[in-house]
Amino acid sequence: MKLLRFGELGQERPALLDAEGLIRDLSGVVEDIAEDTLTPEGLERIGEIDPASLPIVEGTPRIGACVGRVGKLICVGLNYADHAAEAGMDLPPEPILFMKATSSICGPNDDIRIPRGSEKTDWEVELGIVIGKEARYLDPDQAMDHVAGYCVVNDISERAFQIERAGQWVKGKSADTFGPIGPWMVTRDEVADPQNLGLWLSVDGQKYQDGTTQTMVFGVAHLVHYISQLMSLQPGDIIATGTPPGVGMGQKPQKFLREGQLMELGIQGLGQQRQRSIAWDA
């Protein structure tokens, strides 16, 4: 299934995308695409519904973040071998983790606001793992049972805030609008192999990122297992699994977002995003 949320910011309603690409309103069935809805029982309940019995959403509504009330947005750094090579850094011996403020989350096509004082706002297309079952100290072979599905994440990053301002990376990762997710969450059963997905990103029509999840250093199952040893995971938590090469910081010369530019990005089978960069005060 493809589950999504539509409507104005703060007033999103749950929906699914049917086989014909029509948005079907789920608000008469579930409160939101969040928390208990993402559990195996919640997804089974939605899966038993005939999509044709649900109201069609007319027009072209705003698409919101595909998961509501995200408890944790956990990110993995340097998790693509070719991206680490681009950055001139050794492969990490275990996953590099950092948190991204959930207040950064926005819809997949919302404008990206460049923070005040920013000169190095950058892009990162990433595969997002949506947790569907509470997890603590998982055995490796249990990890995938705790995954509800997958989504596209753009891990927008302000490199000067992240790298040059001392402290942790969260400084450059957490501005409002720095976490577009969606357009929808695709349930785990519809993604045959999360380690064989193409992902790409372009700016103003020029493709900068064109990679595959095959080059991940640590795969989906390992990440879920590993993180569960360090913190509990709850339904609706999202893990952003790292980015392939082609970020602006890695260009020669470096390139960063300016006001009025258009980012387009996507992951094979998971949909596409489209964002315009604007001034913070626009």
Explain the meaning of each model-derived region.
Residues 90-108, 121-123, 258-269:
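Structural signature of FAD isoalloxazine-binding scaffolds in flavoprotein oxidoreductases
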Residues 71-74, 94-96, 108-112, 119-127, ...:
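Generic beta-strand structural signal
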Residues 1-95, 192, 207, 281:
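N-terminal non-catalytic cap/leader segment that marks the start of a structured domain
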Residues 131-133, 138-153:
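RNA pseudouridine synthases
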Residues 14, 126-130, 151, 200:
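Residues embedded in well-ordered beta-strands
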Residues 63-65, 86-88, 112-121, 127, ...:
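A generic local secondary-structure boundary/capping motif
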Residues 5, 9-10, 53-58, 62, ...:
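Catalytic-pocket segment enriched in acidic/His residues
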